[in-house]
C-alpha cells in the first residue's frame, strides 16, 4: 500500500485558497440539472465525489461543459425531473452527497434505474430515506441487503404526507427537500427523532432559494413544500470554499502558528462548519473573521467538553487537535460519525491510541487524553479522506507520522498534502 511520511513541522504560516465545498458543489450540480436555463458554476470542487455526480448526470442526458481544471461548469438545465432512456445503472462510488439526493430525485416520474457504489456504500444506511419516499408513492427495491444500496428506482413519487427519521443523516431530509417541489402534489415532511447536522439543511434551503424555490420550515420539525414548482437557473453561481477542508489548516495554525488565513469562506458563509473556528477560539487560539476569509493564530490550547452535533465533519479535526491541548477533551453527540465513509468513532479511537493517547470510545462520544510525547505510528486511513487529513496534524509535534493510502483525500481534496507543505 502506498504511504506518505510527514516529517515534524516546526511552524505553519501563510494563506490557503480553499477548493469548493463538496456539499455545495453536488447540491448545486443537481439543482442546475433540474432547473430551467443554463447555469455557470464557478469554484466547483474537482474531487471523486463530484466526478461521480457529474458522470451520473451525463448518463441521465444532462449536457454540460467543464473547464480544463474542472472548476467551472456550464450546465444546461433539464427544466424538470431527470429521465433515463431505458434501464440504467449508475455507479456512485462512496459519494453520499450523490447517492442520497439522486435516490430521491430519480423517483419522480417513471424510470428504471439502479444506484450502486463501492463496498462501503453498501454498508451506509439509506432505509430511512427509502421509507419516506415510499410513503410518497415511490417504487423502490433493495437489490442486496434490506435498508442499504444498491437500489432499483422505478419512479412513482407524487408527494403527500411523508415522515423521515432525522437522527442518522441530514442527507435524507436534504434529498426529500430538493425533490419535493417537482412532485405533482404538495409534500409535508415531518421529522422523527432529533435532526442531526442541522446546518447542512440550511445549506440545502439556501441553495434551493438561489434556484428560485422557497419552502415553509416549521422549526425544523416539519417542512411544507408546494408541488408542481420548477427550479430557475440563477445564471452564475460561485461555490463557497469548503469549510470542512479549512479546519485542518486553521487547526495547524492553532497548534504551530504563525498565522494561517483561509480564503473562500468568511463570516457570512452558509456552511455550518465555519463554527469550527469558534471551537478553536474556545480552546485558546486567536481567530479573525473577514467577509471572505478566516485566519487563525497560535494560542495555548486547553481541552474542551462540547456537543459537536452541529459540526460532525470538522469535529474530527478537534479530535486530533486535542493531542496538543492541556487536559482531557470530550466530543459529544457524534453518533453519526459511525455511518460516514467508515465508522469514524472506532477509526479515530484506534488511531489516536497508536500515537499514545488515552481514549474512551462511547456509543456517541469520544474522550481523549494526550500523552506527554506522541509516538511515531503508521496511521490506517480506512479509505476515509478525513482520517488522512486529520492525522497529518500529528506531524506538528516533534514526531514524524506515516499516513497509509494518502491518496484517499481525492474524495474531497486531491492536493491536500501539497497545500499543507506550502504553509509548512
Swiss-Prot record:
Q: What is its EC number?
A: 2.5.1.19
Enumerate the active-site residues: 313
Q: Which residues bind 3-phosphoshikimate?
A: 22-23, 27, 169-171, 197, 313, 336, 340
Highest rank taxon of the organism: Bacteria
GO CC annotation terms, alphabetical: cytoplasm
Q: In which pathway does it act?
A: Metabolic intermediate biosynthesis; chorismate biosynthesis; chorismate from D-erythrose 4-phosphate and phosphoenolpyruvate: step 6/7
A Pfam family matched in the record: EPSP_synthase
UniProt-listed PROSITE patterns = EPSP_SYNTHASE_1 (PS00104), EPSP_SYNTHASE_2 (PS00885)
- List, alphabetically, the InterPro entries matched: Enolpyruvate_Tfrase_dom, Enolpyruvate_Tfrase_sf, EPSP_synthase, EPSP_synthase_CS, RNA3'P_cycl/enolpyr_Trfase_a/b
Query: Where along this sequence does the record place binding of phosphoenolpyruvate?
Result: 22, 96, 124, 171, 344, 386, 411
The enzyme class is: transferase
Chief location bin: cytoplasm
Q: Which reaction does it catalyse?
A: 3-phosphoshikimate + phosphoenolpyruvate = 5-O-(1-carboxyvinyl)-3-phosphoshikimate + phosphate
Q: Which NCBIfam families match?
A: aroA
Family assignment from sequence similarity: Belongs to the EPSP synthase family.
Q: What does this protein do?
A: Catalyzes the transfer of the enolpyruvyl moiety of phosphoenolpyruvate (PEP) to the 5-hydroxyl of shikimate-3-phosphate (S3P) to produce enolpyruvyl shikimate-3-phosphate and inorganic phosphate.
The record's subunit annotation is:
Monomer.
Q: Which HAMAP family match?
A: EPSP_synth (MF_00210)
Q: What is this protein called?
A: 3-phosphoshikimate 1-carboxyvinyltransferase
- Origin organism is Shigella dysenteriae serotype 1 (strain Sd197)
Gene encoding this polypeptide?
aroA
Amino acid at each position: 500500500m502506498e504511504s506518505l511520511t510527514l516529517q515534524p513541522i516546526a511552524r505553519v504560516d501563510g494563506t490557503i485558497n480553499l477548493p469548493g465545498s463538496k456539499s455545495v458543489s453536488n447540491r448545486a450540480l443537481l439543482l442546475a440539472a433540474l432547473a430551467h436555463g443554463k447555469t455557470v458554476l464557478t469554484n466547483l470542487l474537482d474531487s471523486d465525489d463530484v466526478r461521480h455526480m457529474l458522470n451520473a448526470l451525463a448518463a441521465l442526458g444532462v449536457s454540460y461543459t467543464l473547464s480544463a481544471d474542472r472548476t467551472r461548469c456550464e450546465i444546461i438545465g433539464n427544466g424538470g425531473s431527470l429521465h433515463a432512456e431505458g434501464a440504467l445503472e449508475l455507479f456512485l462510488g462512496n459519494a453520499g452527497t450523490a447517492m442520497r439526493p439522486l435516490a430521491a430525485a430519480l423517483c419522480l416520474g417513471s424510470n428504471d434505474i439502479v444506484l450502486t457504489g463501492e463496498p462501503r456504500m453498501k454498508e451506509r444506511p439509506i432505509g430511512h430515506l427509502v421509507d419516506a419516499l415510499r410513503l410518497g408513492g415511490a417504487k423502490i427495491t433493495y437489490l442486496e441487503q434490506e435498508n442499504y444500496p444498491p437500489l432499483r428506482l422505478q419512479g412513482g413519487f407524487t408527494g403527500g404526507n411523508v415522515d423521515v427519521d432525522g437522527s442518522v443523516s441530514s442527507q435524507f431530509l436534504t434529498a426529500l427537500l430538493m425533490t419535493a417541489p417537482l412532485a405533482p402534489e404538495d409534500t409535508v415532511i415531518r421529522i422523527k427523532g432529533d435532526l442531526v447536522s442541522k446546518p447542512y439543511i440550511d445549506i440545502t434551503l439556501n441553495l434551493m432559494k438561489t434556484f428560485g424555490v422557497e419552502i415553509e420550515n416549521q422549526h425544523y420539525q416539519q417542512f411544507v413544500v408546494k408541488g408542481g414548482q420548477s427550479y430557475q437557473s440563477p445564471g452564475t453561481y460561485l461555490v463557497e470554499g469548503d469549510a470542512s477542508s479549512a479546519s485542518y489548516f486553521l487547526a495547524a495554525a492553532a497548534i504551530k502558528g504563525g498565522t494561517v488565513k483561509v480564503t473562500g469562506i468568511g463570516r457570512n458563509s452558509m456552511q455550518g462548519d465555519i463554527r469550527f473556528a469558534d471551537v478553536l477560539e474556545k480552546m485558546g487560539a486567536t481567530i479573525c473573521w473577514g467577509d471572505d476569509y478566516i485566519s487563525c493564530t497560535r494560542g495555548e490550547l486547553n481541552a474542551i467538553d462540547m456537543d459537536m452535533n452541529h459540526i460532525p465533519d470538522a469535529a474530527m479535526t478537534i479530535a486530533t487537535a486535542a493531542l496538543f491541548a492541556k487536559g482531557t477533551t470530550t466530543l459529544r453527540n457524534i453518533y453519526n460519525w459511525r455511518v460516514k465513509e467508515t465508522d469514524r468513532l472506532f477509526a479515530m479511537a484506534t488511531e489516536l491510541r497508536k500515537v499514545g493517547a488515552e481514549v474512551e470510545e462511547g456509543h456517541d462520544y469520544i474522550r481523549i487524553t494526550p500523552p506527554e510525547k506522541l509516538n511515531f505510528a503508521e496511521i490506517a486511513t480506512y479509505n476515509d479522506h478525513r482520517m488522512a487529513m486529520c492525522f497529518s496534524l500529528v506531524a506538528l509535534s516533534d514526531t514524524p507520522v506515516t499516513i497509509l493510502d494518502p491518496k484517499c483525500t481525492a474524495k474531497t481534496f486531491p492536493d491536500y498534502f501539497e497545500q499543507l507543505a506550502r504553509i509548512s
